[in-house]
């Protein structure tokens, strides 16, 4: 059989994530595929950079290349966007992801968030309870919704969505771990932090460009929760080039 070397080259600036996953795509077909010159996870790479070289049977490399690139481009896109937000935060506010991930790929996408410098929020519903507007609507008010959660499981940390400052007060009154601010202006977020006085962590759920993260950090909120880092990250352009017979 013909042997060859395949090289993955990135076409745009990125933060690398998922090279081990890409490697496994090739090794699922042939465990003897050899990897050389692999870049580190989390490394910034410039256009034209070689991410890794794969040596093995040409048929193996050609069969797996599409799947390998799909994973690598997707995960690198998430890590790159996350790094943009993390860098913009200057370490003054923690960038969180959400559970809004691709079905069956949550573990990998949350891994890419960590590589990019973000922090995973909840992986599953058993990690904590987020009391949202629908829960409050069904229970009647925030206090009753929280009471029902605690009656079911007193150990789980509780986070409550707050759409108004009155919601913030109600959540603080029942002693939840985190208040998630939803859709309030900067001054209202600042006021929520003031009212909290350390009794609960303040998280801000926002769809803002990364250049506005310093403004959120200035409010004193501990977290910014950004669904876009997994929902809106664009795959990073890469190519897979066969460069000739492997030695």
Enumerate the predicted regions with their spans:
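Cys/His-rich Zn2+-binding cysteine-cluster or related metal-binding knuckle/ribbon modules and their
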Residues: 210
């Amino acid at each position: 059989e013909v042997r060859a070397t395949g090289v993955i080259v990135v076409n745009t600036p990125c933060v690398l994530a998922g090279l081990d996953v890409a490697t496994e795509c090739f090794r699922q077909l042939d465990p003897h595929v050899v990897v050389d010159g692999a870049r580190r996870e989390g490394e910034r790479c410039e256009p034209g950079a070689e991410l890794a070289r794969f040596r093995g049977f040409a048929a193996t490399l050609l069969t797996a290349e599409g799947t390998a690139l799909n994973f690598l481009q997707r995960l690198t896109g998430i890590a790159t966007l996350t790094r943009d937000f993390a860098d913009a935060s200057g370490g003054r506010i923690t960038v969180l992801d959400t559970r809004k991930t691709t079905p069956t790929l949550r573990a990998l996408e949350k891994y890419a968030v960590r590589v990019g410098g973000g922090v995973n929020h909840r992986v599953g519903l058993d990690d904590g309870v987020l009391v949202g507007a629908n829960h409050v609507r069904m229970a009647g008010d925030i206090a009753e919704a929280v009471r029902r959660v605690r009656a079911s499981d007193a150990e789980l940390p509780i986070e409550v969505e707050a759409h108004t400052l009155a919601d913030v007060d109600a959540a603080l009154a029942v002693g939840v771990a985190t208040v998630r601010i939803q859709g309030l202006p900067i001054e209202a977020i600042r006021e929520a932090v003031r009212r909290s006085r350390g009794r609960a962590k303040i998280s801000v759920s926002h769809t803002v460009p990364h250049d506005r993260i310093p403004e959120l950090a200035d409010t004193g909120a501990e977290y910014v929760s950004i669904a876009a880092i997994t929902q809106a990250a664009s795959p990073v352009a890469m190519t897979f080039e066969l460069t000739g017979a492997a030695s």
